[in-house]
């Protein structure tokens, strides 16, 4: 499964590990993905999303119904 937030669209970034001697080795910075179930009152069911804590705050602010319509408009199946 890809490491992409379903709400914010955050993806892994690439960068360097830096040792004390400033040697650079490539690495990935992964988003803090969490799997969370949300109750959708309009559909009378739970929806499981893979999202970051920022995505959870967006759902708290806008509401799960608005966020789900945005996700479905992008063509993702939820």
Curated annotation (Swiss-Prot):
Keyword list, A-Z: Ribonucleoprotein, Ribosomal protein
GO cellular component, one term: cytosolic large ribosomal subunit
Gene3D superfamilies with a match to the protein in the record: Ribosomal protein L28/L24
SUPFAM superfamilies in alphabetical order: L28p-like
GO terms, molecular function: structural constituent of ribosome
Source taxon at top rank: Bacteria
One matching Pfam family: Ribosomal_L28
GO BP of this protein: translation
PANTHER family, sorted: 39S RIBOSOMAL PROTEIN L28, MITOCHONDRIAL (PTHR13528), LARGE RIBOSOMAL SUBUNIT PROTEIN BL28M (PTHR13528:SF2)
Family: Belongs to the bacterial ribosomal protein bL28 family.
Name of the featured protein: Large ribosomal subunit protein bL28
Species of provenance: Colwellia psychrerythraea (strain 34H / ATCC BAA-681) (Vibrio psychroerythus)
